[in-house]
Amino acid sequence: MSMMCYTLIIAFLIGIWAAPKSEDNVPLGSPATSDLSDTSCAQTHEGLKTSRNTDQRHPAPKKAEDQELGSAANIIVDPKLFQKRRFQSPRVLFSTQPPPLSRDEQSVEFLDNEDTLNRNIRAKRENHPVHNQGEHSVCDSVSDWVIKTTATDIHGNMVTVMGDINFTNEVYKQYFFETKCRNPNPVPSGCRGIDSKVWNSYCTTTQTFVKALTMEGSRASWRFIRIDTACVCVISRKTENF
């Protein structure tokens, strides 16, 4: 009788020990834990996607400096390019603001040819030479600093002239000092002070070549280009009618 009781007690204890455990006590790596991990990963991935979509719809505001440099649409120029520059012309100027026409006006910053990393302050040109009382030019001319986008090079080809450049984290414009006739069309009276009974005369704008920074494909390079530099009088002797 006692043996039967012991057998029943042992069978009861074995049955309790073999009963399945709850999900709260499932060891790592079990199917229940894997389902929970997959669910957590899916929720995390969905949260990351939502965050990325929100960032794309509402991008972070850019700094004012970045917006200013981006809107300039300029080309970054290697400082070594200026060290290779030769035949510097006083009619070409790299400046952060429009330069003055007279030395008496406010000076501006520009890149110097000898040391482009050192910006000097000076004015380049005068608007017109000073004449003594009673002196007049045979042709009226006008001078101004201009920005060119295209020009003709020394080989007669049309080239693209760089207007804005990014040099040492500052935006500079390339200015050209041009002089041309005030009246683009010749006047019947001819040049001032020329005897119209003996000479045919007219005023015309002449050009010369200066070294300018241009675009060659996707690279910046120095080229000789033509710009207006003077207004001169052209004369020819009238033929006598017999």
Curated annotation (Swiss-Prot):
Residues 19-125 form a propeptide. Residues 1-18 form the signal peptide. InterPro entries: Cystine-knot_cytokine, Nerve_growth_factor-like, Nerve_growth_factor-rel, Nerve_growth_factor_bsu, Nerve_growth_factor_CS, Venom_nerve_growth_factor. Glycans are attached at N166. Residues 47-66 have a biased composition (Basic and acidic residues). It comes from the Eukaryota. One of its GO terms (biological process) is negative regulation of neuron apoptotic process. GO terms for molecular function: growth factor activity; lipid binding; nerve growth factor receptor binding; peptidase inhibitor activity; toxin activity. Expressed by the venom gland. It is found in: Secreted. Disulfide bonds join C139-C203, C181-C231, C191-C233. Residues 47-70 are annotated as: Disordered. Belongs to the NGF-beta family. Nerve growth factor is important for the development and maintenance of the sympathetic and sensory nervous systems. It stimulates division and differentiation of sympathetic and embryonic sensory neurons as well as basal forebrain cholinergic neurons in the brain. Its relevance in the snake venom is not clear. However, it has been shown to inhibit metalloproteinase-dependent proteolysis of platelet glycoprotein Ib alpha, suggesting a metalloproteinase inhibition to prevent metalloprotease autodigestion and/or protection against prey proteases. The presence of this protein in the venom could not be confirmed. This is Venom nerve growth factor.
